[in-house]
Amino acid sequence: MQEIEIFCDGSSLGNPGPGGYAAILRYKDKEKTISGGENFTTNNRMELRALNEALKILKRPCHITLYSDSQYVCQAINVWLVNWQKKNFAKVKNVDLWKEFVKVSKGHSIVAVWIKGHNGHAENERCNSLAKLEAQKRVKTTT
């Protein structure tokens, strides 16, 4: 299986409010950047949306190392998700996106690594800037 790195970040102005997401996918020396947003959302939803959209791009099963500054996403992937599924996602927030994650992550091996946000991590900073830009675009369209 190919070794892929995914860096992602989500932003929400107001939380909830206009939001944006961004992800960088890296395979060897190749990179692809994606971004987007929603008019009314939360930072956690945008973080997870970034990951889901990145996973949709992959065409074959991969070993993925995910780098995120979201404890929520990292803990969910590494620890909580198995129990959430056993309990059919009872009382889980953002259940639509977690169910989508289960679908789009099928066949992949994913390890989530938490990185401290706003701490000079180059890819995280790039994703953060893009996610904020996407959120700001939506402020202009919703006012």
From Swiss-Prot:
Mg(2+) 2 binds at residues 9, 128. Keywords: Cytoplasm, Endonuclease, Hydrolase, Magnesium, Metal-binding, Nuclease. Its cofactor is Mg(2+). The keyword Nuclease applies. Mg(2+) 1 binds at residues 9, 47, 69. It catalyses: Endonucleolytic cleavage to 5'-phosphomonoester. It comes from the Bacteria. Coiled coil: none annotated. SUPFAM superfamilies: Ribonuclease H-like. One of its GO terms (biological process) is DNA replication, removal of RNA primer. Pfam families: RNase_H. It is found in: Cytoplasm. InterPro entries: RNase_H, RNaseH-like_sf, RNaseH_domain, RNaseH_sf, RNaseHI. GO terms for molecular function: magnesium ion binding; nucleic acid binding; RNA-DNA hybrid ribonuclease activity. Monomer. Belongs to the RNase H family. This is Ribonuclease HI.
